[in-house]
């Protein structure tokens, strides 16, 4: 680590567990049950095709994920990563988490490969907006400009990773360690 030209930190749901967030799979995980209350697999409910067909169903589940994230604070792991970034010239965090806790801890060089639940994007005109939480949002929320349904800027099951995040990761990898 002392001799590395760059450091890449990779995190997933486990890093936010000490902040009180459940992991997605396993005992106590958000997706512990095989099926949702609607009798559908969570992978089907939280998918792009379902968002197009039944946005209210997708949003009900996304809102429950956001509610779990609401008010949660970065933990010591998030803080240490942010401190490392401030002390080293090139530190990049690649995270699968959509909770935004790395940024909340002060990290600036974060690649959120699965997106961020606090950014909404219009499915009609691609307008984006940041939201602190979903409290008070009509579900599904609609774009103020074109009235199309908005979606959280997260990767749903079956969707491709965001090209900009993948390109940034590729740039970091090509720059070497």
What residue ranges belong to the model's regions?
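Conserved catalytic core of sirtuin-type NAD+-dependent deacylases
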Residues: 1-177
């Amino acid at each position: 680590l002392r001799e590395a030209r760059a450091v890449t930190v990779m995190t997933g749901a486990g890093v936010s567990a000490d902040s009180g967030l459940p992991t997605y799979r396993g005992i106590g995980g958000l997706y512990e049950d095989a099926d949702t209350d609607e009798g559908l697999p969570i992978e089907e409910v939280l998918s792009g095709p379902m968002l197009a067909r039944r946005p209210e169903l997708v949003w009900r589940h996304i809102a429950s994920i956001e509610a779990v994230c609401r008010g949660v604070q970065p933990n010591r792991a998030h803080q240490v990563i942010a401190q490392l970034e401030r002390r080293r010239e090139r530190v990049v965090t690649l995270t699968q988490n959509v909770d935004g806790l790395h940024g909340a801890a002060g990290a600036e060089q974060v690649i959120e490969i699965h997106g961020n639940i606090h950014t909404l994007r219009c499915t009609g005109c691609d307008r984006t907006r940041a939201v602190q939480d979903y409290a008070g949002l009509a579900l599904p929320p609609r774009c103020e400009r074109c009235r199309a349904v908005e979606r959280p800027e997260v990767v749903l099951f079956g969707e491709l990773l965001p090209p900009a995040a993948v390109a940034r990761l590729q740039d970091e990898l090509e720059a070497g360690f």
